[in-house]
Amino acid sequence: MSPASSWKRKRPSSSSAQASKKRRVYRPAVSRSLARREPLQVQDFVWDTDVAFNRGGGCYLLTSYARGSAENQRKTAETITYKVAVNLGCAISGTMQQYCISSRPVCWIVYDAAPTGSAVTPKDIFGYPEGLVNWPTTWKVARAVSHRFIVKRRWVFTMESNGSRFDRDYTNLPAAIPQSLPVLNKFAKQLGVRTEWKNAEGGDFGDIKSGALYLVMAPANGAVFVARGNVRVYFKSVGNQ
C-alpha cells in the first residue's frame, strides 16, 4: 500500500489560488432605464429685436412650455428644468451715450415656489426702496416673500459710456473705447426646478400651479440698456400625462 502522503488530497498552491481569484470578474448590473435615458428637451427664446431694460428692470418667464408633442413643449403635467444658457449682447441706450458713465447691471435667475398666475416684476421679488432703484447690486429678496422667491444665480457685468455717440466722426478726436456693448454668456446647470401645471394647454404665468423660473435683469446708475440674443432652457417632461 502506498504511503498516506500519496493519496491525501493536496492543497492548491498559493500561485494557482491567486490565479483563480483573478479570473473572477464581477460586473455591476446596469438598469435599462439608465441605459436608455432620454435626452433633455430644449426651449429657445430668441430676442432678435431690442428688448429694453429701463428703470427698475424687467422679469421674463423661463418655464414657458405649452402642452404638445414638439421638442419645446411639455408632454405631461409636470416638468423639471435642469439648465439655462444665457447668450445676450447688451448695448447702452442711445439716450445715455452722451453721458460719461460706468454702471454695474445685474442679471438673476430666480425661482418662484408659489406663482400667483400674474406677471412678476423685480419690485415684487426684491422690494427695494425707491432710493435704491438704480442700485441693483444692493437688492436682496424681500423678507416678506423670502419663502416664495429664491435666487438661483446672480451675475454682475459692466456697462460704460464715454460721452461719445456712434453717429459722429472721431477721426481727429480720439476717444477711449468704453464697454458699451458687453456680452453676457452664462450657463447655469443643476437647477432642478420642478414645475406643476394646471389642466391647461398654455405655458404662461396663469397656467403654472407651482414652481416657476424667471430671468431678471436691471440697469444700474441710471444707464438703461437694450439686449438681443438667445436664452436656451433645458427641461424634461416627467410624471403622468
From Swiss-Prot:
Main location: virion
Leader sequence residues: none
Location in or out of the cell: Virion; Host nucleus
Motif (Bipartite nuclear localization signal): 1-26
Keyword DNA-binding: yes
Gene Ontology CC, one term: host cell nucleus
Gene Ontology molecular function: any one: structural molecule activity
Gene Ontology biological process terms from the UniProt entry: symbiont entry into host cell; viral penetration into host nucleus
Region Disordered, residue ranges: 1-30
Keywords per UniProt: Capsid protein, DNA-binding, Host nucleus, T=1 icosahedral capsid protein, Viral penetration into host nucleus, Virion, Virus entry into host cell
Function: Encapsidates the viral genome into characteristic twinned ('geminate') particles. Binds the genomic viral ssDNA and shuttles it into and out of the cell nucleus. Plays a role in protection of the genome from degradation, virus acquisition and transmission by insect vectors, infectivity, and systemic movement. The CP of monopartite geminiviruses is absolutely essential for virus movement.
UniProt subunit comment: Homomultimer. Interacts with the movement protein. Binds to single-stranded and double-stranded viral DNA.
Family: Belongs to the geminiviridae capsid protein family.
Record-given protein name: Capsid protein
Organism: Chloris striate mosaic virus
Phylogenetic classification of the source organism: Viruses, Monodnaviria, Shotokuvirae, Cressdnaviricota, Repensiviricetes
